[in-house]
């Protein structure tokens, strides 16, 4: 399972090979076996079969839990990856060993079933009596009847063949007619869909054109209005800037008026250009470097 698996801590004792238990002569097991005639260093089993007897020390496993016998098998199954057999089956198909893998899967399934429902079939022999003789007589009569039936069936089979052929031909004709009708209906549907699509496209194009024309008209009107406003403002500024002589006041000299006009004209021109720039969005965007 890797790092995601359950970590099992194993603590090794002072005697990991369990030699202290086997060498201890004070325990009940050692005393009981010595009473039965066993001596230290001898093997287990009958004296006449010492060649087949066990000569190694007996190793035991202490049961320190309350789980029943065979519970370790279930624990071993949990460690296996889910769907591993399916993955092996897929690999076997890719490698050209599909039959071997299927046979292995079938064997494993049978093992599981045998483990759950263990059964051994024992044959109990066959019953013998009058039933077998009756079946033999009945079989001979059935053979005679079958011979007579076969002759009749041969005569009827020719008519059946002809009727089958005619029915097959009729079915084939019906299928071909049905296919033609389906094809015609499909073509009509395609044509209707195409015409609808063309109409929709034409409508969309017309709407786009109308929108474009409206937009252009609106822009032209706005430009015209701006121009008219601009002209009106310029005329108004000119009127306001021109000096109005009052009655009873002395007229300025020609040299002073010419100088005044030159200064005022430059100032008025600057103010006019500034106002025009503020009113025009395009020029403002150019000044502030803003893209439309």
From Swiss-Prot:
- Its primary localisation, in coarse terms, equals nucleus
Q: Name one GO cellular component term.
A: nucleolus
Q: Which residues form the G-patch domain?
A: 25-74
The record lists its disulfide bonds as none
Q: Which GO terms describe its molecular function?
A: nucleic acid binding
Query: Which processes are annotated in GO (biological process)?
Result: rRNA processing
Bias (Acidic residues) occurs at: 142-158
Instruction: Say which domain of life the source belongs to.
Output: Eukaryota
Locate the compositionally biased regions of type Basic residues. 163-179, 192-236
Report the locations given in the UniProt record. Nucleus, Nucleolus
User: Keyword set for this entry?
Assistant: Nucleus, Ribosome biogenesis, rRNA processing
Q: Where is this region: Disordered?
A: 1-26, 131-267
Q: What does this protein do?
A: Involved in rRNA-processing at A0, A1 and A2 sites and negatively regulates telomerase.
What family classification does the UniProt entry report for this protein? Belongs to the PINX1 family.
Under which name does UniProt file this protein?
A: Protein PXR1
Q: Which organism is it from?
A: Yarrowia lipolytica (strain CLIB 122 / E 150) (Yeast)
Lineage at the top is: Eukaryota, Fungi, Dikarya, Ascomycota, Saccharomycotina
